[in-house]
C-alpha cells in the first residue's frame, strides 16, 4: 500500500507540555532494568516491547510491525520532583530577570507592553526575525521595582549550568516552575514565548519522554553479552535516582537527603540532554570514556546534521591511490579493472541492445566487460552466478535492467578532497586499465591540487541517462580549462611538459627528418609529408597549433630588458605565431602552462573547448617525446660555480655585514636619522633588512651570471617556469639570506640576546639570524638554529591558515548556498529576494573574462595587425 503524499508547507517549533508527553507515550517506564534472565525485554522497563522492537524475530506490541519496519514509540518517566531543562536555563534566567517575583508580570509599564506587543505581532505577520525586539525587551525589563505591584526585585543570577540564585538564596526547580506559571499568556508573548505552542513553565520538566528503542538499540557483542546504548545507560541512572528520591520522600527522609537526591536527579537529566554542559563533570563509562548523549548526537562534525544529512556515504563509488599517465587524454581517467568489475551501470534492455546485454551476462561478474545483476520488470534483483547465468539468459527480454561493468567511454565523476572549488569535482571518461590505481593526466593536477605522493581520489558512477548527459555537457574536464576565479587556464602543462617544450623549440633545436618522425610517432601524432631536409623544433611544435592562429607575446624566459629587441632577442623570448606557424620565440610556461598559458587561453576562447583539449593533449605528448629525445637530468653539479664567483660573493657579503656594523655604530652614537613615522629602533631594523636583502639579491645575480642557460637544466627549469625559481638557485649556490620571524629579524631568545653565544644587546647580522652560507656549502650550527626558527614559523602559519580558511569556507558556503543567478542576470536567494541587480555589479562571468578584464585591447590590436600583415 502506498502512502498519501503530502507537501510540507511550514514547520513550527514549540515546546511539549507534560500532557503532550503523556499522550504521546505508550507506556510509563518505572523499572531501571532492560532484559530478564532469558533475554526478553522487561515490561515497563527501558526495552519494553511497546516502545518498538529491533529484533527481527519479535513484533512491536504497539503497532504489530516487525523489527526493521516499526518506527518506534515514545515512553515517559514521571519525575518525583521537577528539574530544569539544561537547554532552556539561559532563557529561564532571562525570563525570571524580566518578571516580578511576586505578581509574575513583565517589568514594563502597560504602555510599553502594548507598544512591544504590536511590534512583535507586526514582525510575526511579516515573517521577520523577533530576536532584536526580544533582546531589547529583556534589556528594558531589568528594573528594581515592579511597575504593577511595587514589589522590590532582587538580583537573579544563573550559576551554570542550571542553578538559579536570587540574592543569596538558591531557587529550587519547583519554585522556578511556580514563578513561570504565574506569567500570563499575554506577557509570555512579550518575552518571546508563543503561548499557542509553548508555556514558560514547560521549560522545567515534570515528565521526561523516553525515546523509542529504535533510537538507542542494544548490540550483542562477540562474547554473547548485550551492550546498551549510551542513552539507555543514562536513562537507567535517571530511573534509579528518581526511584530512590520517590522512596525517600514517601518515607519522610530528612530534607538534606531529599535535596541531595534531587540535585543528583538534576545532574543526570542535565547530562542526558548535554554531556558537555559547562560547569558539570561529564558522565562517563567504567572505562572513562564520556557518554555520547542527545546534544552530542546532533552537534559538530560527527553529529547527525553534518555527518548524516549534509554528507552521506554512497554506493556506486570507488576510492584508490592516483598515478600519473601522460598518454591518456585530459578528459579521461584510468580505472583499474578490479574496480570496473565491481562498480556497475544500469542499462535498460531494448530490442536493439539485447544481444550485447547477453554477451555481458555470458561473461558474468568475473570477466570484463560483464554484468553483476539483472533487475526484472517487477523490481526483483537477481545476482548473476555461473549457475544462474542460463536461467537469466533464457528469461532476458526488453524491460529488464542489466547492471553491467564499467567500460571505456562511460562518464564518471572524479573528485579529490578537500573540494574547495568547482573544479575539485569534474566528469571524466573511463579508460579501463590494468593494475590498481586511478590514472590521471598530469595537466589536470592543478585544479584538483593533486600530486602523486600517495594522494587518493574518489570516483562516482552515474546511474541515470539524464545525469550522464548533464555531466557530459557541463562537467567534462575540457569545459573547465578556464577558471571562474580569474578567467585564465587552470588546466595546462606542468613541469616536464614545459621543460620539454622549451628544449624542443629553443634556437639550437634542429632535428633530422628521421628524428622528427620518431618524435611524432612517440607522441602519437599524425606523420606529415616528407620535406627532405632537417626540421627546426619550432616547425615540429607548429604542427599542433590551429592553422589560422595569430599571436604575439613575451615568453616566461623574458629577462625584462629595458629596450625589447623583439625578434632579435638573444633569449628567444619574443614569441610570434603567424597563421599557425611558430616564427620566433620559445614555448614555455607562458604558452600553455596552468595559470599562465596564453596560447591555451586564446585557443579556448577563439576555437572552443574541443580544440583546446586536442591542443593540450597533442602539445603535452609532443613535449614529453621531446624531453625523452633530448634527455633531461639535474644534480647538485648544476649549482656548481667557479672559485672566482665564490670569492666575489664572499667579498660582497662581507661588505654588506660591514655596512650593517656601520649602521649599528651610527645608531649607538646617536647619528642615525629616524625615517618619517618610525622610531630609531624601527629605522635601524628596516635599514639593516634592506642592506642584507640587497646583499642576497646581488650575490644571487653574481652566481646567475656564471650559469649557462643552454646546458644548465636547473636554470632551464627555473627560467621557463617549469619548477622552482632563481631565488631557490641563489640560496643553494650563493647565500640563504636573512631569516625572519613575524616579519622582522630574529630578536627573541635569551635575556637581551638571541643565543648565549652572543654578547647582550648585540645587533649584528649574524646574531640576529642572517645566514651567510649557501645550502650547498652547508650552514653552521648557529645559522642552522636560526633557519629552523624561520622554517618553524612557516609550518605553524600554514597549519593555522588551513584551519582558518577551512572554517571560513564552511561559513560562506552555508550562508551563500541558496544564491543563484536568474534569467535576468540578477542574484536572488531561494525566496526570490534580490541580492544584486546585476551579477557582480557588471554582469560579467569571470571565467569568460580576460584575466579579470572584460576585453584585452592590446591583444586584439596585435592580432588584427598580424592578420592584416598575413
From Swiss-Prot:
Residues annotated as binding Mg(2+): 451, 453, 455
Enzyme Commission code(s) on record: 2.7.7.6
Coiled coil feature spans: none
Keywords: Cytoplasm, DNA-binding, DNA-directed RNA polymerase, Magnesium, Metal-binding, Nucleotidyltransferase, Transcription, Transferase, Zinc
GO biological process: DNA-templated transcription
Keyword Transferase attributed: yes
Name of the top EC class for this enzyme: transferase
Main location: cytoplasm
One Gene Ontology CC term in the entry: cytoplasm
UniProt cross-references to CDD domains, sorted A to Z: RNAP_archeal_A
Catalytically driven reaction(s): RNA(n) + a ribonucleoside 5'-triphosphate = RNA(n+1) + diphosphate
Binding locations of Zn(2+) 1: 60, 63, 70, 73
PANTHER family the record matches: DNA-DIRECTED RNA POLYMERASE, DNA-DIRECTED RNA POLYMERASE III SUBUNIT RPC1
Family statement: Belongs to the RNA polymerase beta' chain family.
NCBIfam families reported in the protein's UniProt record: PRK08566.1, RNA_pol_rpoA1
Name of the protein: DNA-directed RNA polymerase subunit Rpo1N
Lineage summary: Archaea, Methanobacteriati, Methanobacteriota, Methanomada group, Methanobacteria
Amino acid at each position: 500500500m502506498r502512502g498519501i503524499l503530502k507537501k510540507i508547507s511550514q514547520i513550527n517549533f514549540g515546546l511539549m507540555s507534560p500532557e503532550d508527553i503523556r499522550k504521546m507515550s505508550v507506556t510509563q517506564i518505572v523499572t531501571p532494568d532492560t532484559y530478564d534472565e532469558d533475554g526478553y525485554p522487561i515490561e515497563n522497563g527501558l526495552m519494553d516491547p511497546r516502545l518498538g522492537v529491533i529484533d527481527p524475530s519479535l513484533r512491536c506490541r504497539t503497532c504489530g510491525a516487525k523489527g526493521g519496519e516499526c518506527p518506534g514509540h515514545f515512553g515517559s518517566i514521571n519525575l518525583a520532583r521537577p528539574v530544569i531543562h539544561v537547554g532552556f536555563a539561559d532563557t529561564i534566567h532571562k525570563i525570571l530577570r524580566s518578571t516580578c517575583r511576586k505578581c509574575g508580570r513583565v517589568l514594563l509599564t502597560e504602555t510599553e507592553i502594548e507598544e512591544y506587543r504590536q511590534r512583535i505581532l507586526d514582525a510575526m505577520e511579516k515573517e521577520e526575525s523577533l530576536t532584536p525586539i526580544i533582546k531589547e525587551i529583556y534589556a528594558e525589563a531589568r528594573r528594581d521595582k515592579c511597575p504593577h505591584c511595587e514589589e522590590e526585585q532582587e538580583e537573579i543570577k544563573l550559576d551554570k549550568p542550571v542553578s538559579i540564585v536570587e540574592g543569596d538564596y538558591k531557587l529550587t526547580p519547583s519554585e522556578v516552575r511556580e514563578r513561570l506559571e504565574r506569567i500570563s499568556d499575554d506577557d509570555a508573548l512579550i518575552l518571546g514565548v508563543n503561548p499557542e505552542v509553548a508555556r514558560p513553565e514547560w521549560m522545567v520538566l515534570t515528565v521526561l519522554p523516553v525515546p523509542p528503542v529504535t533510537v538507542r538499540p542494544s548490540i550483542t557483542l562477540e562474547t554473547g553479552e548485550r551492550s546498551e546504548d549510551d542513552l539507555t545507560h543514562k536513562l537507567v541512572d535517571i530511573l534509579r535516582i528518581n526511584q530512590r528520591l520517590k522512596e525517600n520522600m514517601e518515607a519522610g527522609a530528612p530534607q538534606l537527603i531529599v535535596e541531595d537526591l534531587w540535585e543528583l536527579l538534576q545532574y543526570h537529566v542535565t547530562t542526558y540532554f548535554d554531556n558537555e554542559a559547562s560547569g558539570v563533570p561529564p558522565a562517563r563509562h567504567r572505562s572513562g570514556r564520556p557518554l555520547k548523549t542527545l546534544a552530542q548526537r546532533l552537534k559538530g562534525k560527527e553529529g547527525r546534521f553534518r555527518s548524516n544529512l549534509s554528507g552521506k556515504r554512497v554506493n556506486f563509488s570507488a576510492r584508490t591511490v592516483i598515478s600519473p599517465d601522460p598518454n591518456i587524454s585530459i578528459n579521461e581517467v584510468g580505472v583499474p579493472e578490479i574496480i570496473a568489475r565491481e562498480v556497475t551501470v544500469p542499462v535498460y534492455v531494448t530490442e536493439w541492445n539485447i544481444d550485447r546485454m547477453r554477451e555481458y551476462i555470458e561473461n558474468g561478474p568475473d570477466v570484463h566487460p560483464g554484468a553483476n545483476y539483472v533487475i526484472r520488470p517487477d523490481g526483483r534483483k537477481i545476482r548473476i552466478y555461473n549457475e544462474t547465468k542460463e536461467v537469466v539468459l533464457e528469461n532476458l527480454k526488453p524491460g529488464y535492467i542489466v547492471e553491467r561493468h564499467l567500460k571505456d567511454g562511460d562518464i564518471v565523476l572524479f573528485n579529490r578532497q578537500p573540494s574547495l572549488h568547482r573544479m575539485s569535482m569534474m566528469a571524466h571518461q573511463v579508460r579501463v586499465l590494468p593494475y590498481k590505481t586511478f590514472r590521471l593526466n598530469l595537466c589536470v593536477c592543478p585544479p584538483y591540487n593533486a600530486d602523486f605522493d600517495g594522494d587518493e581520489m574518489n570516483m562516482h558512477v552515474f546511474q541515470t541517462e539524464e545525469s550522464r548527459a548533464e555531466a557530459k555537457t557541463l562537467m567534462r574536464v575540457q569545459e573547465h580549462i578556464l577558471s571562474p576565479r580569474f578567467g585564465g587556464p587552470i588546466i595546462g602543462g606542468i613541469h616536464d611538459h614545459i621543460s620539454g617544450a622549451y628544449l624542443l623549440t629553443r634556437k639550437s633545436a634542429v632535428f633530422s627528418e628521421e628524428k622528427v618522425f620518431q618524435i611524432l610517432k612517440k607522441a602519437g601524432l599524425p606523420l606529415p609529408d616528407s620535406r627532405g631536409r632537417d626540421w627546426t623544433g619550432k616547425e615540429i611544435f607548429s604542427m599542433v597549433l590551429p592553422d589560422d592562429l595569430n599571436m604575439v607575446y613575451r615568453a616566461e624566459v623574458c629577462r625584462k630588458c629595458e629596450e625589447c629587441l623583439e625578434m632579435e632577442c638573444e633569449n628567444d623570448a619574443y614569441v610570434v605565431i603567424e597563421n599557425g606557424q611558430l616564427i620566433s620565440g620559445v614555448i614555455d610556461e607562458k604558452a600553455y602552462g596552468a595559470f599562465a598559458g596564453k596560447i591555451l587561453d586564446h585557443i579556448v576562447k577563439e576555437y572552443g573547448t574541443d580544440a583546446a583539449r586536442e591542443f593540450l593533449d597533442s602539445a603535452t605528448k609532443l613535449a614529453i617525446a621531446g624531453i625523452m629525445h633530448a634527455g633531461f637530468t639535474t644534480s647538485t653539479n648544476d649549482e656548481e660555480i667557479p672559485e672566482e664567483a665564490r670569492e666575489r660573493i664572499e667579498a660582497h657579503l662581507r661588505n654588506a655585514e660591514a655596512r650593517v656594523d656601520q649602521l649599528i655604530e651610527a645608531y649607538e652614537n646617536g647619528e642615525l636619522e629616524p625615517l618619517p613615522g618610525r622610531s630609531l629602533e624601527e629605522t635601524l631594523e628596516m635599514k639593516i633588512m634592506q642592506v642584507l636583502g640587497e646583499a642576497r639579491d646581488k650575490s644571487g645575480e653574481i652566481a646567475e651570471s656564471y650559469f649557462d642557460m643552454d646546458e644548465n637544466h636547473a636554470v632551464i627549469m627555473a627560467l621557463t617556469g617549469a619548477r622552482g625559481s632563481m631565488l631557490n638557485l641563489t640560496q643553494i649556490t650563493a647565500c640563504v639570506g636573512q631569516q625572519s620571524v613575524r616579519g622582522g629579524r630574529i630578536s627573541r631568545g635569551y635575556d637581551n640576546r638571541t643565543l648565549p653565544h652572543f654578547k647582550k644587546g648585540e645587533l649584528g647580522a649574524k646574531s640576529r639570524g642572517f645566514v651567510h652560507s649557501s645550502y650547498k656549502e652547508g650552514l653552521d650550527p648557529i645559522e642552522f638554529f636560526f633557519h629552523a626558527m624561520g622554517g618553524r614559523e612557516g609550518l605553524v602559519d600554514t597549519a593555522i591558515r588551513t584551519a582558518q580558511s577551512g572554517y571560513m569556507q564552511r561559513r560562506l558556503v552555508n550562508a551563500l548556498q541558496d544564491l543563484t543567478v536568474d534569467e535576468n542576470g540578477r542574484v536572488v536567494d531561494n525566496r526570490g529576494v534580490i541580492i544584486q541587480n546585476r551579477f557582480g555589479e557588471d554582469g560579467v562571468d569571470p571565467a569568460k573574462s580576460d584575466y579579470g578584464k572584460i576585453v584585452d585591447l592590446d591583444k586584439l590590436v596585435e592580432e588584427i595587425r598580424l592578420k592584416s600583415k598575413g
